[in-house]
């Protein structure tokens, strides 16, 4: 994928002879592991911790310089071999070619006219690198013993990639040689480039990604040096931080979920050829054909010969694109910023508000999102704000009053306010909250635009400033939208306009409504941030059903490395193991990891 593929040429053909002892690196990684396993820093201390971790990582990188396995020549020199290998193994290679589109990097260009919805690309399972193929590879024995590898498919896939890269006769060599030698994910940012993200909503995920990656490397360095099942791994004599950073970046920018062979569950996969497609706005047009056992992609739109072929990666924010894919997408119609909100337990009405929220399937405290498009808030956030601003009498009506179920049902529907006063309160609150968030940035929108226009910036610095600017523009838009809504509902209240009343006959209208905010909360496929997704049973059920039904790759099925999903679930477990390792545990086995 081109924007994820802005790379330098690769340098050498084999790993160099080690000039530093494993024991010396083991001591440094133990120190790194201990640092990365310490409790989360307090407010305002994250940058300090990041700098300390980075200092240790740079010390390790300096000692390991020149030890990584890379390839001779330019990346594009290996494209003919990739196409030949793909063709010989049943993939489609007609109708497109790989081309450097400069700003977007490498991508696919149509060599003939392709019609919208035409099947133009398919890749059989045989060519995919998956968690299943990792289990059946040289990594298998260690995988069977290490709980982290078993629980975190993205890490297993990263090690699978490293082991195959270090094996000259690997079946996947033509694919691996065509991958970038470095990426534009924040793992590759210089410290000054990361500094541009200070005070942004995204910086916390950047810190988390860096810390988790460093911790994982330190943990697995010891595993590879001491575990008996790691003796035969081709990484035994050379496993550098540079290697691991490259592998996790390759996986996080390319991984997707596909069904297992029997279709009973999903697994993570790297998909050659298809992963060269760049992103644009649209709909997901890639799926998995279980009958033919292959990944298939149909054209998003008409593509004329000579035009770049785009696909839609999914409804991701620019923060997600920058952090997990290494690019910023201008005019992202799905861009959004996080906003953390919660009902205080000291609130006199906390118990009642918590009960109403529970009936609507919403947690009392969570991460929501403000959106780039109108309306700036989703049905879920609207419902939360309505409950947050309810009076005691309004809460009673939603718990005990007539039509209480209907009232819960319409909480997320903009057509049915709780009261005019409630609407004024919630939009006033949102306006104030977004205004406060804007004040936390160290630069203004105008200053960011000036820097982008008048300074010679690196690609990564440009991405960081664009992300910072984008967050502020969304917040500013939310402030203006909230102010307009506040005044509208204040006028309704002053004029004592009658409140719209919900009736069952309204249901058809609600279901056919275009605007997301008009849909009743319980009918809506909520599109919120990861923290909210995990807290909502409704969303979880819908997502799982869709993944199972479609067997889809791309879109929202990706599991990025280090900031959420599997990693968050395993932080406690991994930390426990990490602390044990840092203390110098003599056990060679990782069986001690508690689930």
Swiss-Prot record:
Name assigned to this protein: Actin-histidine N-methyltransferase
Q: Which InterPro entries match?
A: Rubisco_LSMT_subst-bd (IPR015353), Rubisco_LSMT_subst-bd_sf (IPR036464), SET_dom (IPR001214), SET_dom_sf (IPR046341), SETD3 (IPR025785), SETD3_SET (IPR044428), SETD3_SETD6_MTase (IPR050600)
Q: Where is the composition biased (Polar residues)?
A: 10-20, 584-595
Q: Mind listing the GO biological process terms from this record? A: actin modification; peptidyl-histidine methylation; positive regulation of DNA-templated transcription; regulation of uterine smooth muscle contraction
Q: Which reaction does it catalyse?
A: L-histidyl-[protein] + S-adenosyl-L-methionine = N(tele)-methyl-L-histidyl-[protein] + S-adenosyl-L-homocysteine + H(+)
Q: Where is this region: Disordered?
A: 1-22, 552-595
* Single Gene Ontology MF annotation: actin binding
Q: Name one GO cellular component term.
A: nucleus
Q: Which UniProt keywords apply?
A: Actin-binding, Cytoplasm, Methyltransferase, Nucleus, Phosphoprotein, S-adenosyl-L-methionine, Transferase, Ubl conjugation
Residue ranges under compositional bias (Basic and acidic residues)? 573-583
Organism annotation? Otolemur garnettii
Q: Where is the SET domain?
A: 94-314
Q: Which family does it belong to?
A: Belongs to the class V-like SAM-binding methyltransferase superfamily. SETD3 actin-histidine methyltransferase family.
The encoding gene is SETD3
| Its biological purpose | Protein-histidine N-methyltransferase that specifically mediates 3-methylhistidine (tele-methylhistidine) methylation of actin at 'His-73'. Histidine methylation of actin is required for smooth muscle contraction of the laboring uterus during delivery. Does not have protein-lysine N-methyltransferase activity and probably only catalyzes histidine methylation of actin.
The domain section of the record reads: The SET domain specifically recognizes and binds actin, suggesting that it does not accommodate substrates diverging from actin.
Keyword Acyltransferase: yes or no? no
Q: Which Pfam families match?
A: Rubis-subs-bind, SET
